């Protein structure tokens, strides 16, 4: 093959005159450019680390300080109180003619020491300021005097033009809550779902735990909190994710969707080219720390540690425990198409390929007529197998096909060029969205490399999607990247009138490299077994997408309520109607206010929420009575959410106590019971408009339809939701078809009914009032209400397969 000749930089040969070496100038040039890029990257990383280390100060502040000291010295003033003279005495004596140089060096050393002390003081002061969470606990719109003072001080100490990791040294550590408070909150959270007998027994176990073991476990936990960056996040990653032996597919991955109404181009290769270029632009900005840190209220920074592993990252399977492999750089992506794997370079001559050049390379892969090797088509099903099984097979695969395996695992990310279309269609909008969600979550079980940090999925009609492995980071991080990608590839890079990427192709680029897998016979049976298991798991998932458009965030805002709390309480009503009982409910809340914080659980099924649900199902209760109970439930949920965000949650603390007890070989019936609980309703809100790269009000059809995840329990639901602009909410519901207790479509109908019933309690929502509140009768008005969102502009930009 032609590219094989470019694999080496010289060719030795033996002649009658001796050995000769023929150097290849193009390859040597590539080696030089690659080394130059590597050195530039190292220098850039060093400089950025220096800038973030001295933040909120800057190198200019050192120069100002040094100049001030020199000026004072020139005016025969000694701001060092004699220290500079002592420093001069310690410097070598180079003779009288260099006496002035010694003074300058002494001033520079003193300025550096003083500058370092000031930086340390700023770090400590900012860390103390950021440890204040009173602002979080105050009612929305009612800012107290201490909070106003705090905001002013944060502005003073925060510096200017922060880089992505500028605040990392100043973030406070996550506090260890009081074990008595945690146990009390836990008992309060399970009271609505336990019988009196079960609750009394749980309370006895809790008191026994507090009396016998809690103080010892808490002591070890506090010791870790003083030593480690975060007392729980590393254990959460290890024991919840990396030590789990379940398949990643459905159990530990989640998906993100493209624009709901718009597909910028129907050309698969063009969409892939722009998307990959946008993703690598994001990586470039990430490496240079040009992405600004996320700030709450425009002032309070969130931890940025999770951004480090977005790209060049793979979860490597192990027999007992996986590990995360992260490379500093990668100049290729791994591509899967029609059962074949390709290694496609993303850079040429030290520069990122243009979108048009990337489109050209993807088109070459699409046009490649070569068939898949035996069992190559289903090879990726191994990544959907139980982790221990995949680890054993990978050991053999690494021996037999090391080069191909390294090309996939060492890629910046994985790209799957699917042969089928996806997205919203005119013929059957509901079914098409459900199929779209299922394709992103599980695919066919063998067309995603689930170990990669994320897989970019490009469908045949140009629709995009993302499948994300969960261990390395949480949804807001990948959502931030995805938001940048969609906005950049559509609004900044754009497409020509014929749907191609802008620019010109590069015919000099080598063909993408087809990966060769030398698969031994013993692996064939493992692949077949993994494929069978992946298909069973994939076909068992029931995905349902509910675009609800009768009202959205603007209506909830007019009711003066938290939009997230509004949805959470409505979900309790919907789930009760679906199952006839209350259950443990998991809502993910972020703890990135702290260094290396990840998530905390909000236990949304509260006593207050249950009281509201019972009132809604009681025909004797009036609307004002239900509304009063609803407001109480919302206030309680808000209090729990704020407590979780400020490090005063329940579940991460109990989890860490349980891990310590296992290390100490202590048996705690209470912690064992807590650890064995099943979350039958797992929920999460998908963040949106984190970067504000375009105004969604001016482009209402360019809204992402969010994403979803699999259920946490075999007899439970996974529900995610996203506020699309001001007038639409999209729900992603998942469950297991094998369960006789769940039905994603049924819950979707209950969610729509519950939203309308709750809205009808408010004066602004009287037009939603229905005759039989709580009856579960279908209201067809909102079944296809989202179709009215389509505008003339969006119609013109949609492909034939889109609505």
Curated annotation (Swiss-Prot):
GO cellular component: AMPA glutamate receptor complex; axon; dendrite; endoplasmic reticulum; endoplasmic reticulum membrane; glutamatergic synapse; postsynapse
Gene3D superfamilies tied to this protein: 6.10.250.1760, Chloramphenicol acetyltransferase-like domain (3.30.559.10), Choline/Carnitine o-acyltransferase, domain 2 (3.30.559.70)
Name this polypeptide is given: Palmitoyl thioesterase CPT1C
Entry keywords, A to Z: Acyltransferase, Cell projection, Disease variant, Endoplasmic reticulum, Fatty acid metabolism, Hereditary spastic paraplegia, Hydrolase, Lipid metabolism, Membrane, Neurodegeneration, Transferase, Transmembrane, Transmembrane helix
Location of region: Disordered: 772-803
Predominant place of localization: other
Membrane topology: Multi-pass membrane protein
Variant or mutagenesis effect after changing residue 470 to A: Loss of palmitoyl thioesterase activity. No effect on carnitine O-palmitoyltransferase inactivity
Binding site for CoA: 552-564
Similarity section: Belongs to the carnitine/choline acetyltransferase family.
Gene name tied to this protein: CPT1C
UniProt-annotated location(s): Cell projection, Dendrite; Cell projection, Axon; Endoplasmic reticulum membrane
Chain ranges on the Cytoplasmic side, renumbered to this chain: 1-52, 127-803
Organism: Homo sapiens (Human)
GO biological process: carnitine metabolic process; fatty acid metabolic process; regulation of postsynaptic membrane neurotransmitter receptor levels
Oligomer status and interactors: Peripherally associated with AMPAR complex. AMPAR complex consists of an inner core made of 4 pore-forming GluA/GRIA proteins (GRIA1, GRIA2, GRIA3 and GRIA4) and 4 major auxiliary subunits arranged in a twofold symmetry. One of the two pairs of distinct binding sites is occupied either by CNIH2, CNIH3 or CACNG2, CACNG3. The other harbors CACNG2, CACNG3, CACNG4, CACNG8 or GSG1L. This inner core of AMPAR complex is complemented by outer core constituents binding directly to the GluA/GRIA proteins at sites distinct from the interaction sites of the inner core constituents.
Keyword Acetylation: no
Disease named in the record: Spastic paraplegia 73, autosomal dominant: A form of spastic paraplegia, a neurodegenerative disorder characterized by a slow, gradual, progressive weakness and spasticity of the lower limbs. Rate of progression and the severity of symptoms are quite variable. Initial symptoms may include difficulty with balance, weakness and stiffness in the legs, muscle spasms, and dragging the toes when walking. In some forms of the disorder, bladder symptoms (such as incontinence) may appear, or the weakness and stiffness may spread to other parts of the body.
PROSITE patterns for the chain: ACYLTRANSF_C_1, ACYLTRANSF_C_2
Xref: Pfam families: Carn_acyltransf (PF00755), CPT_N (PF16484)
């Amino acid at each position: 093959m032609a590219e094989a000749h470019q694999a080496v930089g010289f060719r030795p040969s033996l002649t009658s005159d001796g050995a000769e070496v023929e150097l290849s100038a193009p390859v040597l040039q590539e080696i030089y450019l690659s080394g130059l890029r590597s050195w530039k990257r190292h220098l850039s990383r060093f400089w950025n680390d220096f800038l973030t280390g001295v933040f909120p100060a800057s190198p200019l502040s050192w120069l100002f300080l040094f100049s001030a000291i020199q000026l004072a010295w020139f005016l025969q003033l000694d701001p060092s109180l004699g220290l500079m003279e002592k420093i001069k005495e310690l410097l070598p004596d180079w003779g009288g003619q260099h006496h002035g140089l010694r003074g300058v060096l002494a001033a520079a050393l003193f300025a550096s020491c003083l500058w370092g002390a000031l930086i340390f003081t700023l770090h400590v002061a900012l860390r103390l300021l950021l440890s204040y969470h009173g602002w979080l606990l105050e009612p929305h719109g009612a800012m107290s005097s201490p909070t106003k003072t705090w905001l002013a001080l944060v502005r003073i100490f925060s510096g200017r033009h922060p880089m992505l990791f500028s605040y990392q040294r100043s973030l406070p550590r996550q506090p260890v809550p009081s074990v008595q408070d945690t146990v009390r909150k836990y008992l309060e959270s399970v009271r609505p779902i336990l019988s009196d007998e079960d609750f009394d027994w749980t309370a006895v176990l809790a008191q026994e735990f507090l009396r016998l073991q809690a103080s010892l476990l808490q002591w070890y936990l506090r010791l870790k909190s003083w030593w480690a960056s975060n007392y729980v996040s590393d254990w959460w990653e290890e024991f919840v994710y990396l030590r789990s032996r379940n398949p990643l597919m459905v159990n530990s991955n989640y998906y993100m969707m493209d624009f709901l109404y718009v597909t910028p181009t129907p050309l698969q290769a063009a969409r892939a080219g722009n998307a990959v270029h946008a993703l690598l632009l994001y990586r470039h900005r990430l490496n240079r720390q040009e992405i600004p840190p996320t700030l709450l209220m425009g002032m309070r920074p969130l931890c940025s540690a999770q951004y480090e592993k977005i790209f060049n990252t793979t979860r490597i399977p192990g027999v007992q425990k996986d590990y995360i492999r992260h490379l500093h750089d990668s100049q290729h992506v791994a591509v899967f198409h029609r059962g074949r794997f390709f290694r496609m370079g993303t850079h040429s001559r030290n520069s990122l390929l243009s979108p048009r050049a990337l489109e050209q390379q993807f088109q070459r892969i699409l046009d490649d007529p070569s068939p898949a090797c035996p069992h190559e088509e289903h090879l990726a099903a191994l990544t959907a197998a139980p982790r221990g099984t995949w680890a054993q097979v990978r050991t053999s695969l690494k021996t037999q096909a090391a080069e191909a395996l390294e090309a996939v695992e060492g890629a910046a990310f994985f790209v799957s060029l699917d042969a089928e279309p996806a997205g919203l269609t005119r013929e059957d909008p509901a079914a098409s969205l459900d199929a779209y969600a299922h394709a992103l979550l599980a695919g066919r079980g063998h067309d995603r490399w689930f170990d990669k940090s994320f897989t970019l999925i490009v469908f045949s009609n140009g629709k995009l999607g993302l499948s994300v492995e969960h261990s390395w980071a949480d949804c807001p991080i990948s959502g931030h990247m995805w938001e940048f990608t969609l906005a950049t590839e559509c609004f900044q890079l754009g497409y020509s009138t014929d749907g191609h990427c802008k620019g010109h192709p590069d015919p000099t680029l080598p063909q993408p490299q087809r990966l060769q897998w030398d698969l031994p016979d013993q692996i064939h049976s493992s692949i077949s077994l993994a494929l069978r298991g992946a298909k069973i798991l994939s076909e068992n998932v029931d995905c349902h997408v509910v675009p609800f458009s009768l009202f959205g965030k603007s209506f909830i805002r007019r009711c003066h309520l938290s939009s997230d709390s509004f949805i959470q309480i409505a979900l309790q009503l919907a789930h009760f109607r679906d199952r006839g009982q209350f259950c443990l409910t998991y809502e993910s809340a972020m703890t990135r206010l702290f260094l290396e914080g990840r998530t905390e659980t909000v236990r949304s099924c509260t006593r207050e929420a249950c009281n509201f649900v019972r009132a809604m199902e009681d025909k004797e209760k009036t609307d004002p009575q239900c509304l009063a109970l609803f407001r109480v439930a919302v206030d309680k949920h808000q209090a729990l959410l704020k407590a979780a965000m400020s490090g005063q949650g329940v579940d991460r603390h109990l989890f860490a106590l349980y891990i310590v007890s296992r290390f100490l070989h202590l048996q705690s019936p209470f912690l064992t019971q807590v650890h064995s609980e099943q979350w039958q309703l797992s929920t999460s809100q998908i963040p949106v408009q984190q970067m504000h790269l375009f105004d969604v009000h001016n482009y209402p059809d360019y809204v992402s339809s969010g994403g979803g995840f699999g259920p946490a329990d075999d007899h439970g639901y996974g529900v995610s939701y996203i506020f699309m602009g001001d007038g639409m909410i999209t729900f992603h519901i998942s469950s297991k078809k094998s369960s006789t207790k769940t039905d994603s479509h049924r819950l979707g109908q209950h969610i729509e009914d519950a939203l309308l019933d709750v809205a009808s309690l408010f004066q602004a929502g009287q037009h939603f009032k229905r005759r039989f509140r709580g009856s579960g009768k279908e209201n067809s008005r909102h079944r296809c209400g989202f179709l009215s969102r389509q505008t003339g502009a969006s119609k013109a930009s949609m492909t034939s397969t889109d609505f």
